[in-house]
From Swiss-Prot:
InterPro entries: Mur-like_cat_sf, Mur_ligase_C, Mur_ligase_C_dom_sf, Mur_ligase_cen, Mur_ligase_N, MurCDEF_pg_biosynth, UDP-N-AcMur_Ala_ligase_MurC. One of its GO terms (biological process) is regulation of cell shape. The gene is murC. HAMAP family: MurC. This is UDP-N-acetylmuramate--L-alanine ligase. It is found in: Cytoplasm. GO terms for molecular function: ATP binding; UDP-N-acetylmuramate-L-alanine ligase activity.
């Protein structure tokens, strides 16, 4: 369903406090749309949206929808939600969150960032880069960006940078002028069923690029490279990036420093690439952002300067604090490839010291599908405690627990009791070590408990922002 923002009337969001929903609300309010919404319980985020002008309610009830013309839901909202039932009974327009975001983007030049991994960081990099270049983009990112202070905002520049989520196929609601594909691997098989269906969805996504549009794709990833070849074969303009000299934006790492080489009208140009965020995966994300910036008219030196100042996105190798020389980080990684990238980065940051991990599997279906791959990726750490599965939207699968991962590798320890897992992990730490909480569930809350466990009365905790 394709709709214009001004046709929506008064918009009611069910689950307004969610990260993705609240970002769209901010943008709609800034663009003069009347907004109401509800969430399961009162929170600081709910009160903040109320202060911005939304009519907000704690708890779900049919009367909350009164006066609305359009109702917005996410995949997490169940069919028996009383507000959704009321909306359908009354014949109100019901949009998925992605359709509402598409309506908000309809009048702008859309940069949509897709990929199994790296979407949030790459989207954040592009938004920060374009803002610092004075292009004043609107943006919607999957996590809060410290440099921007929020995860979404309205800009007056006529450019909209959006993270395009493939998990439920909703990225097919967007109409990108510039599409970025960081990688394309099997994931979210609970929705797609097969790896082939995942790739078909990505093929459909790049098929949305108009004749005068652009695909930016990573040559390091087989899936993204295949998509680039398919797009080029049907006449779509493609810019590739990666560690291969065949890429048009080329990452060079000679050991002493990184550089970026790219094609200009007068021939190849090479400049130093400096980043605060660790890991080769983030260097590749930076190349994607750089390629988009060049396409939108940003000077190369200005783009690299902005990237050098980029400090990351929330829950993407985010520093949480330090006690007794032991640093604690948090990462959203929830796929084996992401876990491997996070731990490779942690190894670099640890500089020879130990890396200890508290991992929480996310989704029963993903744990069942990738147990052995998770075990292999986690084994890059020196000490690994595995919690039980964070179910999110899923019902349990018989026989599938966090222990399924530890069975594949004796180096891993299954401990479903989080407090005991933290206690065991902290007991193994020494000065200079890194502790990393990993997963897309509520394991992020463990960072504070780890810092508390590390602290003693004589030592003060240094918390990260």
């Amino acid at each position: 369903m394709s709709v214009e923002l001004n046709d929506l009337g008064r918009v009611h969001f069910i689950g307004i406090g969610g990260a993705g929903m609240s970002g769209i609300v901010r943008i709609m309010l800034a663009r003069g749309i009347s907004v109401s919404g509800s969430d399961a319980k009162e929170s600081a985020g709910l009160l903040e949206l109320g202060a911005l002008g939304a009519s907000v309610h704690a708890g779900h009830a049919a009367q909350n929808v009164a006066g609305a013309d359009t109702v917005v839901i996410s995949t997490a909202i169940r069919a028996n939600n009383p507000e959704l039932e009321f909306a359908r009974t009354q014949g109100l327009r019901v949009l998925h969150r992605s359709e509402a975001l598409a309506a908000a983007m309809a009048q702008d030049t859309v940069v949509a960032v897709a990929g199994t991994h790296g979407k949030t960081t790459t989207t954040a990099m592009i938004a920060v880069l374009l803002r610092e270049a004075g292009l004043d983009p609107s943006f919607a990112v999957g996590g809060t960006v410290p440099a921007l202070g929020v995860n979404a905002a309205h800009g007056a520049g006529g450019i909209f940078v959006a993270e395009a989520d493939e998990s439920d196929g909703s990225f097919l609601n967007y109409r990108p002028q510039i599409a970025v594909v960081t990688n394309a691997e099997p994931d979210h098989l609970d929705h797609y069923g097969t790896a082939e269906a995942v790739m078909e969805a990505f093929q459909s996504f790049i098929g949305l690029i108009p004749a005068d549009g652009l695909l930016v794709a990573c040559t390091d990833d087989d899936g993204a490279l295949a998509l680039a070849k398919q797009a080029a074969a049907r006449g779509t303009r493609v810019v590739t990036y990666g560690r291969s000299a065949a890429a048009e934006v080329w990452l060079i790492n000679d050991g002493a420093h990184r550089a970026i080489e790219f094609i200009t009208p007068i021939g190849p140009q090479r400049l130093v690439l400096e980043l605060q965020v660790p890991g080769e995966h983030n260097a590749l994300n930076a190349l994607a952002a750089f390629a988009v910036a060049l396409e939108l008219g940003v000077e190369a030196e200005q783009a690299l300067s902005a990237l050098a100042g980029f400090t990351g996105a929330a829950r993407r190798f985010e520093f949480k604090g330090q006690v007794r020389g032991i640093r604690v980080f948090d990462d959203y990684a929830h796929h084996p490839t992401e876990v491997r990238a996070a731990l490779t980065a942690a190894r670099t940051v640890a500089d020879g010291h130990h890396v200890l991990v508290l991992f929480q599997p996310h989704l029963f279906s993903r744990t069942h599908e990738f147990a052995a791959e998770f075990a292999a990726a986690l084994s890059l750490a020196d000490s690994i405690m595995v919690l039980d599965v964070y179910p999110a939207r899923e019902d349990p699968i018989p026989g599938v627990t966090g222990e399924l991962i530890t069975e594949a590798n004796a180096k891993l320890t299954f401990q479903p009791d989080r407090a005991k897992a933290i206690q065991e992990l902290v007991a193994r730490t020494a000065n200079g070590d890194i502790v990393l909480t990993v997963g897309a569930g509520d394991v992020t809350e463990a960072g504070a408990a780890i810092l508390d466990a590390l602290a003693t009365p004589a030592q003060e905790v240094s918390h990260g922002g």
